[in-house]
Swiss-Prot record:
The enzyme's E.C. designation: 3.13.2.1
Chain sites annotated for binding NAD(+): 197-199, 231, 260-265, 283, 318, 339-341, 387
Cofactor binding, note field: Binds 1 NAD(+) per subunit.
Subcellular location: Cytoplasm
InterPro entries cross-referenced by the UniProt entry: Adenosylhomocyst_ase-like_sf (IPR042172), Adenosylhomocysteinase-like (IPR000043), Ado_hCys_hydrolase_NAD-bd (IPR015878), NAD(P)-bd_dom_sf (IPR036291), S-Ado-L-homoCys_hydrolase_CS (IPR020082)
Gene3D superfamilies referenced in this protein's UniProt entry, alphabetically: Adenosylhomocysteinase-like, NAD(P)-binding Rossmann-like Domain
Lineage of the species this protein comes from: Bacteria, Pseudomonadati, Chlorobiota, Chlorobiia, Chlorobiales
Function according to Swiss-Prot or TrEMBL: May play a key role in the regulation of the intracellular concentration of adenosylhomocysteine.
The organism of origin for this protein: Chlorobaculum parvum (strain DSM 263 / NCIMB 8327) (Chlorobium vibrioforme subsp. thiosulfatophilum)
UniProt pathway: Amino-acid biosynthesis; L-homocysteine biosynthesis; L-homocysteine from S-adenosyl-L-homocysteine: step 1/1
Encoding gene, per UniProt annotation: ahcY
Highest rank taxon of the organism: Bacteria
UniProt-listed CDD domains: SAHH
Cofactor(s) the protein requires to work: NAD(+)
Protein name: Adenosylhomocysteinase
Length: 471
């Protein structure tokens, strides 16, 4: 499973799955025109030559195409998954067999997860990465927290708040014992991070506001060709895939409660409605609530929805959205799942520690909780990402959008010296990403005449919208 050396080559579930993984990667490549066009554009130019990239992002077949794109562009890459359940073991095996150090397998413990994250930050010769591809911000967090500990070692004496913190601090304690300036050296060599998801971007902005951000960051999530496609259309397909693979339930006729109506929530609400469910939306934001209502969804509180809901989906990026008290009041046989990045949207720890419920594992990532009155609920993927824990995540085509943005962001950070801040990719690159995907689905663009372009004040070749435009 591993090779013994100063720097580990890989750790995956089963390297013999590599051939299967390679066959699926070849299929995905045909569905990911943005990444393949980027490879062709930079063929022979190696714009990432010399870059050491640490990737913390779901180790799926689609991610394998991203990894091999970065390698073809000249980067030295090490990779781990950003979720304990999201790895596709045949994808990890194929990447390991191709010679890329990957540390990921489906069903990691928290200790294993943070060990894997540590491995991607340790390159040959004692070097750290100079670029990070992050999803949720855990690789970035490890560096920043380690840096803080080196400034204040007493942090290691504090009692961890939960199992996740305990596992993370255990790794950081080991690193500190080996080299009490390790993370200062890593941070000094960093050119930047590109962040994939809403939750990770939120972390970056928080660190920037507090003056704690150590290196530049590009917010890939808020590229239009990411948030309005991956978050919306990706979730519209992969949510139902996860629920159905986990439970085989008929969605038509059920009442689905979607908590949150941002881009992800919109995709989930439309997904459930397209299958014939009656959808109830909960929201804190009056604008999003009004949008949901104007789309014909009932908008109310979860407390009122508990009397009707059969399927619950959290999409908020917040914590304690579904509490233990909520779950105790749900209808018999209710299905509870999350599609936000972290597992704290649902109070899973409180449910597991509740003496009035018995947990019965049905199959991997499907647990039944039987309450004392005989009612039960089903929790999917232990409250983690249902589309990746119980299925295979978003389809390749929509991930090509997101990962082309990631690739362009990595080139941008490597080629330029940014000040420490959180940036977005410029509009012309957003439009380029979209343009690369049009031919695959038979789209033909209209071309402005010079007179038309002058009339509305834009270049003939774009960009066509101002930065403040909301798509």
């Amino acid at each position: 499973m591993t090779t013994e050396a100063a720097v580990l080559d890989y750790k995956v579930a089963d390297i013999s799955l590599a051939e299967w993984g390679r066959k699926e990667i070849e299929i995905a490549e045909k569905e990911m025109p943005g990444l393949m066009a980027t490879r062709k554009k930079y063929e022979g130019k190696k714009p990432l030559a010399g870059a050491r990239i640490a990737g913390s992002l779901h180790m799926t077949i689609q991610t394998a195409v991203l990894i091999e794109t970065l390698v073809e562009l000249g980067a030295d890459v090490r990779w781990a998954s950003c979720n304990i359940f999201s790895t596709q073991d045949h994808a990890a095996a194929a990447i390991a067999a191709a010679g890329v150090p990957v540390f990921a397998w489906k069903g990691e413990t928290l200790d294993e997860y943070w060990w894997c994250t540590r491995q991607i930050l340790e390159f040959e010769g004692g070097l750290g990465p100079n670029l990070i591809v992050d999803d949720g911000g855990d690789a970035t967090l490890m560096i920043h927290l380690g840096y803080k500990i080196e400034n204040d070692p007493s942090m290691l004496d504090k009692t961890p708040g939960n199992a996740e913190e305990r596992a993370l601090f255990a790794q950081l304690k080991e690193v500190f014992a080996e080299d009490n300036q390790r993370w200062h050296k890593v941070a000094a060599g960093m050119k930047g991070v590109s962040e994939e998801t809403t939750t990770g971007v939120h972390r970056l902005y928080q660190m920037m506001e507090k003056g704690e951000l150590l290196f530049p960051a590009i917010n890939v999530n808020d590229s239009v060709t990411k948030s309005k496609f991956d978050n919306l259309y990706g979730c519209r397909e992969s949510l139902a895939d996860g629920i159905k693979r986990a439970t085989d339930v008929m969605i038509a006729g059920k009442v689905a409660v979607v908590l949150g109506y941002g881009d992800v929530g919109k995709g989930c609400a439309h997904s459930m409605r397209s299958y014939g469910a009656r959808v109830i939306v909960t929201e804190i934001d009056p604008i999003c609530a009004l949008q949901a209502a104007m789309e014909g969804f009932q908008v109310t509180t979860i407390e009122e929805a508990l009397e009707e809901g059969n399927i619950y989906v959290t999409t908020t990026g917040n914590k304690d959205v579904i509490t233990l008290e909520h779950m105790k009041k749900m209808k018999d046989e209710a299905i509870v799942c999350n599609i936000g990045h972290f597992d704290n949207e649902i109070q899973v720890d409180a449910l597991n520690n509740f003496k009035g419920a018995t947990r019965i594992n049905i199959k991997p990532q499907v647990d039944k909780y039987v309450f004392e009155d005989g009612r039960c609920i089903y929790l999917l993927a232990e409250g983690r990402l249902v589309n990746l824990g119980c299925a295979t995540g978003h389809p390749s085509f929509v991930m090509s959008n997101s990962f082309t943005n990631q690739t362009l962001a990595q080139i941008e950070l490597w080629k330029n010296n940014y000040d420490v801040d959180v940036y977005r990719l410029p509009k012309h690159l957003d439009e380029e990403v979209a343009r690369l995907h049009l031919g695959q689905i038979g789209v033909k663009l209209t071309t402005l005449s010079k007179e038309q372009a002058d009339y509305i004040g834009v270049p003939v070749e774009g960009p066509y919208k101002p930065e403040h435009y909301r798509y």
